[in-house]
C-alpha cells in the first residue's frame, strides 16, 4: 500500500516522534512518503474556483505536485500538533489546496495523529477529530484510526512506551 504522511509540524518534536513510531511498524509492508508542508512554497487558497475548471491550482506553487502524490496514495496519514484548539496552519494549507482535486481524494484510507499539550480528554482533540470526521464523510474516506496524545516536553512521547508500541502496532497491522 502506498501511504502518504503529511507532517503538520515544523518542529522535530513529539509529532515527528509519533510519525516515526508509525513508520517503524508500517515500513516493512508499505511504501511510505512524508510530505513536510513547512518546507514547501504554499500560497493560501484564494477561493477563486478556477481549479474546478482546470487541472490543479492556478498558483504555481509546490502543492500542485504534492497533491498529485496525495491523490495517488492508497492511504493518507494526517499528523499535527494542536495549535489554538485546531490543526496546524501548515497542515490546513495543504488540506485547503486539496480542494482542487477533491474528487480524486475520495475513498482513501485515512488516519490521524494529533499531539497536544493538554490531556487527551480536552476539547481541542474533539474539535480536530470533528473536522476530520466531516472531511471523511464528504470524501467517503475509510477512517482507519484517530489517535490523540498528550505530550509537552520535547521527548515526552518517546518515553511513553505504551504510545510508541501502539503507533508501531497500528502501522504493522495495516
Task: Describe each model-derived feature in a short phrase.
Residues 1-79, 85-101, 143-147, 157-174:
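N-terminal beta1-alpha1-beta2 submodule of the flavodoxin-like/Rossmannoid cofactor-binding fold
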Residues 80-81, 137:
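Acidic, low-complexity intrinsically disordered regions
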Residues 105-146:
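Short, glycine-/small-residue-rich phosphate/pyrophosphate-handling segment
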Amino acid at each position: 500500500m502506498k501511504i502518504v504522511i503529511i507532517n503538520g509540524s515544523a518542529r522535530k518534536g513529539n509529532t515527528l516522534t509519533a510519525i516515526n513510531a508509525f513508520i517503524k511498524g508500517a515500513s516493512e509492508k508499505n511504501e511510505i512518503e512524508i510530505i513536510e508542508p513547512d518546507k514547501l512554497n504554499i500560497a493560501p487558497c484564494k477561493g477563486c474556483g478556477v481549479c474546478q475548471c482546470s487541472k490543479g491550482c492556478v498558483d504555481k506553487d509546490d502543492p500542485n505536485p504534492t497533491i498529485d502524490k496525495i491523490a495517488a496514495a492508497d492511504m493518507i496519514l494526517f499528523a499535527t500538533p494542536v495549535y489554538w484548539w485546531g490543526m496546524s496552519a501548515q497542515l490546513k494549507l495543504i488540506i485547503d489546496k486539496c480542494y482542487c482535486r477533491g474528487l480524486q481524494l475520495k475513498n482513501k484510507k485515512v488516519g490521524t495523529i494529533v499531539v497536544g499539550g493538554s490531556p487527551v480528554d480536552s476539547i481541542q482533540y474533539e474539535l480536530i477529530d470533528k473536522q476530520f470526521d466531516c472531511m471523511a464523510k464528504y470524501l467517503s474516506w475509510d477512517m482507519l484510526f484517530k489517535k490523540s496524545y498528550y505530550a509537552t516536553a520535547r521527548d515526552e512521547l518517546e518515553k511513553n512506551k505504551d504510545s510508541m508500541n501502539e503507533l508501531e502496532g497500528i502501522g504493522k497491522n495495516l
